[in-house]
């Protein structure tokens, strides 16, 4: 294209854009001004690299290639226009467009006359939008100056998961045309990502020495301040948020700020400490899991032994019941045999009597057959002289006590069931209802010995906040009553009115300087005296022996050393007055 003046820009650097209008066929500008005779410049909007003496494509001779591109005889120079679009994910990208819609061999390049107004870009910090697309207004949270913005550090954040998921995708080079290559670095100054080929100017050129190269970044807008549109290069330690340099002088004025690199190093140290603590906790949990696996085996073995004992005892019980049953059965059989023997004796006696009666009957039948009357009478007289009536048959009564035996056995069964149920209920409720595993009352690594030695005597005093009332209760004699010093109001705690009271309370023994409780609006820390930290407005300025800071001893990094006990860093120190009234010696 002869004498063409093309300019490529993505809007990242407004200074690099060339706002000149395309020249007409005669070589003059469309607005009538004189054409610029300087060399054409091609500006890379991503890297800011400007090369002189180069044009888009090869130069066309006069009259060549015109008929191939345009059907009419009118020669119109190409108009290159960049359109910025925003997709659903909020990512910005640029494309080239023209009025007639003819596409060049290059991706996004359109040739033809432009009937649309030129692309205009907003000022820095404002959202740049395309006039060829529907306007998309971003949702920006307006924060008033001085308003505190704190991070809550949630355990699981969907935005963090989305960023991690998007970060796993490949970042493409912004300078490649057509087949985009994978980006290897991103430049914060150019706000673009480059592949190995397009990264060479940043590595070799002297103009790009000050450019900061990072790992490929997908969303550069996330690194910009939502209020000012500048890159967030600072970190506010007061509000725990990333800010730009304009925020440091406006919303975060007089706040403690550091660079994001320093804040990252500090947070990485904190993160490493948390990882070590989590690793120690994981090791502790794994040890507990191993211990509980052994306990599970012990529980199974113990339960198996208990089942064996149960089976053995109930087998013995059933065997004893079988013995008792056999004894009752033997008694029944013995009684049956005795009764049968008695019946046999009775039957034998009756058979003997029946035999005698049969003999008497036969004698009388023989006498009845005598035909001689004299002989019959003589024999009859002799028979009747010894005759007597047969005695009556003996009577017997059989006692069948089956119902009585059944009632006795029923009572025995009820008694056995009652005794068995009573013992089984006792075993189930008293012995078997107790769980194998019982949760301890002291948890979270608490010092059991320390807590047990004092909670029994002070009740619920451990829930008292860090105020003067909490620590003043320990300033009384160790053996006396635990009466805390409670002033009526903080304003009465002045040095003039309470100096005498504190001297009487603490004593004057030793070389300690008398100090009293003072009410201050803010907690003031002193290097030589301990102070009570927290939400309290009181600062403790007592004797050095009244409160001491426990410095933990250096221990090797083992899983046991990670267990911190309750009140291991800051414990109240009791005063032992001893025999003297004014003594404040340490025990």
From Swiss-Prot:
Coiled-coil intervals: 259-348
Residue numbers bearing the Phosphothreonine modification: 476
GO annotation terms (biological process): innate immune response; negative regulation of protein localization to nucleus; negative regulation of transcription by RNA polymerase II
Species whose genome carries this gene: Mus musculus
Zinc finger (B box-type): 220-260
Keywords: Coiled coil, Cytoplasm, Immunity, Innate immunity, Lysosome, Metal-binding, Phosphoprotein, Zinc, Zinc-finger
Oligomeric and partner information: Interacts with VIM and HINT1. Interacts with IKBKG/NEMO. Interacts with STING1.
Residue numbers binding Zn(2+): 225, 228, 247, 252
PANTHER family assigned: B-BOX DOMAIN CONTAINING, TRIPARTITE MOTIF-CONTAINING PROTEIN 29
General function of this protein: Plays a crucial role in the regulation of macrophage activation in response to viral or bacterial infections within the respiratory tract. Mechanistically, TRIM29 interacts with IKBKG/NEMO in the lysosome where it induces its 'Lys-48' ubiquitination and subsequent degradation. In turn, the expression of type I interferons and the production of pro-inflammatory cytokines are inhibited. Additionally, induces the 'Lys-48' ubiquitination of STING1 in a similar way, leading to its degradation.
Phosphoserine carried by residues: 21, 28, 58, 104, 489
Source taxonomy: Eukaryota, Metazoa, Chordata, Craniata, Vertebrata
Listed name of the protein: Tripartite motif-containing protein 29
Disrupted gene: phenotype observed: Absence of TRIM29 enhances macrophage production of type I interferons and protects mice from infection with influenza virus.
Phosphoprotein keyword on record: yes
Modified residue annotations for Phosphotyrosine: 106
GO terms of molecular function: identical protein binding; p53 binding; zinc ion binding
SUPFAM superfamilies, per the entry: B-box zinc-binding domain (SSF57845)
């Amino acid at each position: 294209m002869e004498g063409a003046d093309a300019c490529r820009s993505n809007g990242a650097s407004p200074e690099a854009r060339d706002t000149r209008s395309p020249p007409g066929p005669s070589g003059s500008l469309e607005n009538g001004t004189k054409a610029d005779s300087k060399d054409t410049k091609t500006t890379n909007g991503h890297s800011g690299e400007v090369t002189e003496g180069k044009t888009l494509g090869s130069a066309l001779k006069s009259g060549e290639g015109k008929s191939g591109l345009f059907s009419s005889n009118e020669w119109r120079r190409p108009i290159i226009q960049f359109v910025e679009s925003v997709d659903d994910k909020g990512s910005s990208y640029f494309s080239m467009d023209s009025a007639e819609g003819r596409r060049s061999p290059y991706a996004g390049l359109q040739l033809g006359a432009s009937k649309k107004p030129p692309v205009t870009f907003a000022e820095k910090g404002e959202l740049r939008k395309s006039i060829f697309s529907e306007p998309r207004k971003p949702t920006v949270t307006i924060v008033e100056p001085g308003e505190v913005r704190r991070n809550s550090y949630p355990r699981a954040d969907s935005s963090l998961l989305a960023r991690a998921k998007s970060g796993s995708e490949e970042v493409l080079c912004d300078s490649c045309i057509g087949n985009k290559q994978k980006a290897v670095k991103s430049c914060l100054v150019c706000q673009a990502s480059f592949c190995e080929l397009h990264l060479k100017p940043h590595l070799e050129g002297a103009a790009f020495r000050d450019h900061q190269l990072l790992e490929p970044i997908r969303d550069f807008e996330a690194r910009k301040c939502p209020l000012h549109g500048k890159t967030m290069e600072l970190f506010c330690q007061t509000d725990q948020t990333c800010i730009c340099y304009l925020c440091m002088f406006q919303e975060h004025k007089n706040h403690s700020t550091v660079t994001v690199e320093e804040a990252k190093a500090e947070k990485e140290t904190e993160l490493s400490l948390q990882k070590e603590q989590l690793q120690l906790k994981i090791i502790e949990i794994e040890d507990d899991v191993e211990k509980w696996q052994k306990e599970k085996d012990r529980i199974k073995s113990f339960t198996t032994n208990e089942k064996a004992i149960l089976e053995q005892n109930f087998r013995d019980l059933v065997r004893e019941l079988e013995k008792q049953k056999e004894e009752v059965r033997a008694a029944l059989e013995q009684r049956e045999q005795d009764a049968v023997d008695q019946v046999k004796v009775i039957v034998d006696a009756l058979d003997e009597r029946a035999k005698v009666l049969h003999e008497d009957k036969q004698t009388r039948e023989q006498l009845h057959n005598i035909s001689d009357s004299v002989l019959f009478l003589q024999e009859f007289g002799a028979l009747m002289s010894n005759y007597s009536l047969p005695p009556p048959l003996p009577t017997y009564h059989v006692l069948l006590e089956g119902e009585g035996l059944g009632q006795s056995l029923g009572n025995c069964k009820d008694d056995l069931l009652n005794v068995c149920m009573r013992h089984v209920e006792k075993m189930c409720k008293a012995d078997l209802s107790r769980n194998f595993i019982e949760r301890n009352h002291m948890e979270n690594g608490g010092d059991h010995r320390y807590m047990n030695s004092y909670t029994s005597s002070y009740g619920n005093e451990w829930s008292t906040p860090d105020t003067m009332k909490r620590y003043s209760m320990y300033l009384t004699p160790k053996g006396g009553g635990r009466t805390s010093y409670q002033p009526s109001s903080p304003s009465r705690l002045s040095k003039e009115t309470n100096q005498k009271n504190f001297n009487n309370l603490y004593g004057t023994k030793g070389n300690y300087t008398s100090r009293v409780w003072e009410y201050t609006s803010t907690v003031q820390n002193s290097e030589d005296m301990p102070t009570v930290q927290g939400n309290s407005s009181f600062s403790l300025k007592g004797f050095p022996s009244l409160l001491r800071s426990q410095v933990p001893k250096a221990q090797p990094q083992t899983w046991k050393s990670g267990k911190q006990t309750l009140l291991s860093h800051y414990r109240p120190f009791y005063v032992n007055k001893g025999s003297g009234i004014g003594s404040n010696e340490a025990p």
